[in-house]
Amino acid sequence: IILLVSLLCLIGIYAYAKNWEKISEAAEDEKNKPLQAHYSIPMLSHETLPLLKYAEEGDALIEVPLLSQKDSGYKTGCELVSAAMVLQYYGETITPQQLYEAIDKVDTPVNADGIGVSPHKYFIGNPEKSNGYGCYAEPLINAINKLLQRERYAVNIKDTDLATIERTYLAQDTPVILWATIQMKPPKEGNRWTLEDGTQFQWLAGEHCLVLVGADEDYYYFNDPDYGDGVIGYEKELVQQRYDELGRQAIVISR
């Protein structure tokens, strides 16, 4: 009887351990879901995205080379791919890989001492991995300017409203690197960490970087590195909302 009870206990412990392993794996997957923010193979349609429009022949668009994250191998490197598109528009041969080499970067958002870093200073994570983060405008500007070596230079036009961007830049055939969200869906609360100055930072899952290449009365048009099959447009009001939520961040290259 004692042996039977012991055997049943061992079986129970093993079953519990296996079940806990499955629970832990599921929890880890769920934890990472909000962070897989940059890369997908979008099934873009008017049924799933009623505010989307495909660019048509005759639309007034800046002809920026279209690159994709998939082809670049950068699942979470939308910022790098978007910047490369704009640089190639100006005749530069700079690649997303060169931009990643040049950018200030860290592997994880929090170091061994528990101190976090800001995406305003660093590219966070590995762009080849689906659980990477990315960066905001400032480190991308620094990387671009390292590579351009003053022949041209990146300019931070943060807080410029979209109507002004349309009049000032698009009208002069100047494409704009712009922060919004994937497929213009609402951002979600991502991981939170403490910065060196003691302030709390929260990553917005769904953060995305695109190239603004045109506008009409109702839509803004983008080269979207997450979608490599053509220029797509989103309703202006929706783009404005996502642009605001991501801190009204935008970059242009001086001519």
Residue map of PLM features:
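Short, solvent-exposed, low-complexity loop/linker segments
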Residues: T168-V176, A180-K188
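Soluble periplasmic/extracytoplasmic beta-strand elements of cell-envelope proteins
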Residues: V86, I177-W179, V211, Y221
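Noncatalytic regulatory segments and standalone regulatory/sensor domains
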Residues: R192-L204, L210-R255
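Active-site-adjacent structural segments surrounding the nucleophilic cysteine of cysteine proteases
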Residues: I2-P139, I182, G190-W193, Q200-W203
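A structural motif
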Residues: C135-L148, L178-A180
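Surface-exposed ligand/attachment interfaces on beta-rich extracellular proteins
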Residues: D161-T168
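Loop/turn elements at helix/coil->beta-strand transitions in domains of secreted/extracellular proteins
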Residues: Q149-Y153, A171-I177, D216-Y219
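A mature extracytoplasmic/lumenal domain signature
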Residues: S82, D159-D161, A180-M184, G214-D216, ...
